[in-house]
Curated annotation (Swiss-Prot):
Pfam families: Yip1. GO terms for molecular function: small GTPase binding. GO terms for cellular component: Golgi medial cisterna; Golgi trans cisterna; late endosome membrane; trans-Golgi network; transport vesicle. The gene is Yipf2. This is Protein YIPF2. InterPro entries: Yip1_dom (IPR006977), Yip5/YIPF1/YIPF2 (IPR039765).
Length: 312
């Protein structure tokens, strides 16, 4: 009986007194607390799982939309719009990389980063063509101021010639180079290859150094002009060689040397042709000779030598 009394329910006096003082107070048991905690844990855990599932579903939908989105055709404007989607900092960084080439620094890998653009090459070529035509005309204007006997007339055709020359060089030479490297890639399995747009981008940015060089050619001193021309050519050609070397080094030494020599030679011909054509010495038809007094013929009688006839 004593054991049964011990197992019977006993009311504590303190609890009874507290309930008597605050009859409206709610009471909870330990089992209720455990139940509520489990319920909260289940709700929180289910919320996290639901959020993760929603995130995964959104990622799947995004990837599916990207896959289902049709790629624009190469003859449409949308296809080329992505190549002009660059900001000023990217263009300035690529210009800086073309002006400061050094061995082991690949312009394509360090500056293009598999994102070639046409914005920089397009405007660099346009600026170079315009500067060539303007400075070529300014050379004649300055020469006329030094020698008034020189007759100057604006040569607007130089704008067209400069534009055709620069744009053809910036597109046709990279096209030929890319085609040759692609052909050599079929014979050499380990040989890498740049894309056509990467090659065009490299050539376009390599022409930027000629813009300040052409402006400095306004100095009317021949040896200074040739010095700045050689310096600009060296920087531009070095950038091309350092960029193309990782691609051609897997080929034979003869082919690599011949290819790089051809690249430098074509670059030198461009610079030399611009120097000799747009800054050439004045032709003879631009120089008007000063009028000179022609001596009279000895058979012609001057008025003072004619004597009046007298009659006797």
């Amino acid at each position: 009986m004593a054991a049964a009394d011990e197992l019977a329910f006993h009311e504590f006096e303190e609890a009874t007194n507290l309930l008597a003082e605050t009859p409206d107070a709610a009471t909870t048991s330990q089992s209720d607390e455990l139940t509520s905690r489990e319920h909260v844990a289940v709700v929180v855990g289910s919320g996290i799982g639901y959020g993760a599932e929603v995130g995964e579903e959104e990622d799947d939908k995004t990837s599916l939309l990207q896959e289902e989105k049709p790629q624009p055709r190469f003859w449409t404007f949308d296809y080329y719009q992505s190549f002009f989607d660059v900001d000023t900092s990217q263009v300035l960084d690529r210009i800086k990389g073309s002006l400061l080439p050094h061995p082991g620094h690949n312009f394509v890998r360090h500056h293009l980063r598999n994102r070639p653009d046409l914005y920089g090459p397009f405007w660099i070529c346009a600026t170079l063509a315009f500067v060539l035509a303007v400075t070529g005309n300014l050379t004649l204007v300055l020469a006329q101021r030094r020698d008034p006997s020189i007759h100057y007339s604006p040569q607007f055709h130089k704008v067209t010639i400069a534009g055709i020359t620069i744009y053809c060089y910036a597109w046709l030479v990279p096209l030929a180079l890319w085609g040759f490297l692609r052909w050599r890639q079929g014979t050499r399995e380990r040989m890498g290859l740049y894309t056509f747009l990467e090659t065009v981008c490299v050539y376009g940015y390599s022409l930027f150094v000629f813009i300040p060089t052409v402006v400095l050619w306004l100095i009317p001193v021949q040896w200074i002009q040739w010095l700045f021309g050689a310096l600009g050519l060296a920087l531009s050609a070095a950038g091309l060689v350092f960029t193309l070397w990782p691609v051609v080094r897997e080929d034979t030494r003869l082919v690599a040397a011949a290819l790089l020599s051809t690249v430098v030679l074509l670059h030198a011909l461009l610079a030399l042709g611009c120097k000799l054509y747009f800054f050439q010495p004045l032709p003879l038809d631009h120089v008007v000779p000063a009028p000179q007094a022609t001596p009279p013929s000895p058979n012609v009688l001057l008025p003072s030598s004619i004597q009046p006839m007298t009659t006797s």
